[in-house]
């Protein structure tokens, strides 16, 4: 009986450890295409402009080494610019590269990805969890305005 419990525990542990493990080896052309669309384009959700004349924008750069940089750019009503960077790690959570994983229980479930749009459901929590929350988000290629 003890051997069965140990065997079951090992199997369960292997399943949990295999989740969200970065793929080793070569990628096929479809996988390379998804990686290129995510990493070769700088993405933004767009500039949010407020009634007082201030604005805010979040700019995302993903690297093929599994890291990202999110730059938050805030411009106050007087035109003063303030930037802050957040760095983190990401990986694919599913074998078909349809979900990005950021750690903890934070995921992006990709809805559409091409050269003009990166749309996804920003999800916190596991699928089928009644406490899971998600929000639809659209990113577009970032074009820095020239002053």
Regions found by a protein language model. Give the residues of each.
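Lipid interaction determinants
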Residues: 20-87, 93-147
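Sec-dependent bacterial lipoprotein signal peptides
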Residues: 1-18
């Amino acid at each position: 009986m003890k051997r069965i419990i140990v065997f079951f525990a090992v199997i369960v542990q292997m399943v949990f450890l295999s989740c969200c493990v970065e793929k080793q080896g070569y990628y096929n052309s479809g996988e390379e295409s998804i990686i290129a669309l995510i990493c070769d384009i700088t993405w933004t959700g767009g500039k949010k402009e407020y009634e007082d004349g201030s604005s805010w924008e979040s700019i995302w750069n993903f690297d093929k080494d599994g890291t990202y940089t999110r730059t938050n750019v805030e411009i106050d009503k007087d035109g003063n610019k303030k930037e802050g960077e957040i760095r983190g790690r990401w990986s694919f959570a599913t074998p078909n590269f349809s979900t990005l994983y950021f750690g903890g229980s934070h995921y992006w479930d990709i809805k559409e990805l091409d050269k003009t749009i990166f749309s996804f459901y920003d999800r916190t929590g596991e699928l089928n969890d009644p406490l899971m929350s998600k929000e639809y988000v659209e990113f577009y290629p970032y074009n820095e305005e020239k002053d």
